[in-house]
Amino acid sequence: MIGTIKHKGLRLYEKNDRSGIRPDLVDKAQKILSALEASDSPEDMALPMFRFHPLTGDRRGTYSLTVKANWRVTFRFHNAAAYDVNLEDYR
């Protein structure tokens, strides 16, 4: 389940509004958001196509999924829900 979305563009999942996200990222981002909505734990997202991995250091407790190239969806998980779902450019 998705608890909170941090990135305005990812609200496309709630409102089906694609204007806040690059067109080449929309399809994969929608797949990731649908999978997050259906997940009960971060490990549910450990599919090869998402390249799931936990972050370390000061980002410990945050997980990352690859959208395309250097673009990632990051999130925290608590009580069977994803929080602070964000779209980040890892440059």
PLM segments and residue spans:
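Catalytic-pocket segment enriched in acidic/His residues
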Residues: 75
